[in-house]
Amino acid sequence: MKSYLEQAFGRGDVTSARMQAAIREWLNLYYGTQSPGEDAADRLAVLAVSKLCRTVFAEYESRTAEALAPSLQALDAVRVQAMQYALVGGECLLKPVLHGRGFDFVPIRRDCYAPLGRDAHGALTGVGTMEVLRHDGRGYLLLERRTAGADGLTIETRLFELAGEALGREVPLATLPATAQLQPSLLLPGVRGVGLAALRTPLLNCVDGGPDAVAVYAPAAGLMHSAARLEYQMRQEFENGASRVFASEDLLREDGYGRRTLQDDLFIGLPDDPANVGVTVYSPQLRVEQFLARKQDILRSCESLIGFKRGILSEVEAAERTATEITSSEGDYNLTIQELQAMWQNGAGQALELCAALGKVYGMPGLSFDAGKDLTMDWGDGVLFDRTRTWNEYMSMVTSGLLRPELALAWYFDLPHADAAQLAKIRKELMPQAAQAAPANNEEKKGETQIGA
């Protein structure tokens, strides 16, 4: 892709060679590409990404303004795929595509686009994409360049006919039905950036210190290779540890394929001493415990570098740990999940803001967006929060007379409880006996402390 973009637009990928090699390594770890001397059967990268993704969206709910609700619904439909792409490659782009009354979204993996420019914060100022098309037995290459500018987004599109593996001659966009409606150059005023929302992992670049985002397991990539080598050694140990029969040369004979085997009746009439027949059985001792102990050390180190709590990749430690150690491990995991949830919320806000800007360009009425007001995301209780324990504490306070039951119920059912009318409504709907006992005009005490205020 890099050479094609350079030939077509005179601008190549700004990603460093070290970073490109690291991206290939992350993808190989995730997709289980075998390396010499390694066994990728464990697929630790897949396990890490799937665990994080499931936890991030375990209790996820989202709401937005009615005009953008179809677009948010389409965005939520691809949230898992987009999050996984971002965790694997460090960055994932979300491309809005006009569909009906809103927009659909297409997640773009890190190795499927080329950054042509970045600002000081790592945001894309130019990006190139490539698509291979087939028509009438011929291959075509559709190249697109997006450039951010003060006047808006500029999109340049060029179509080339492939000449084998090389970029051939340029042909008009009207050559193919799929590209006939495209324009060679298009300016979208009012559209910020490159017209693509970005999901970027919150990790600092540990590869070359550049502006590119890194995979969530990038710090643990070396340990994952060590685990793969250890798995390969363990497999070899088991294969080489099979029992072997050593027999004298005169007891072997060749079959019709040239393979040397023992005689069929060799084991029929063995005397008491096998040495008299020239046969020795050897069963080597396997080093299973040493291999497993080393593997657990590697997995625990991976958990520390990724930000997992103990027991997600490794086995739960048999030895008891102090409360401080347990709290530290779970606290790190909670922070990891919160950072990824903030990453998605920021990316979703970018996507909906982009939909509103594109809606104005396309003449779609009523599309406006304010991330602080129009987008609400509920992530549930979180990793560390124990709802049952908190409810029991509130009930204990109610029993002791330290907390009004209306406030406890308001917290449990997430009901408004700011004034007397709202508390009276809670009594009427959830505490019928108390509502009957209390006078209808009973004035609530002022200065009540709200839960969660």
Predicted segments, located by residue:
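Extended, helix-rich architectural segments
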Residues: 1-124, 439-453
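Generic detection of long, well-ordered alpha-helical segments
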Residues: 69-76, 84, 213-224, 228, ...
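Short loop/turn hinge sites at secondary-structure boundaries
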Residues: 89-91, 135, 401
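C-terminal anchoring/interaction modules
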Residues: 254-273, 279-284, 289-306, 322-453
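Extended, charged amphipathic alpha-helical segments
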Residues: 179-328, 364-365, 375-378
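Extended, regular secondary-structure scaffolds
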Residues: 93-209
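Generic structural signal for hydrophobic core residues of well-folded globular domains
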Residues: 30, 44-52, 56, 60, ...
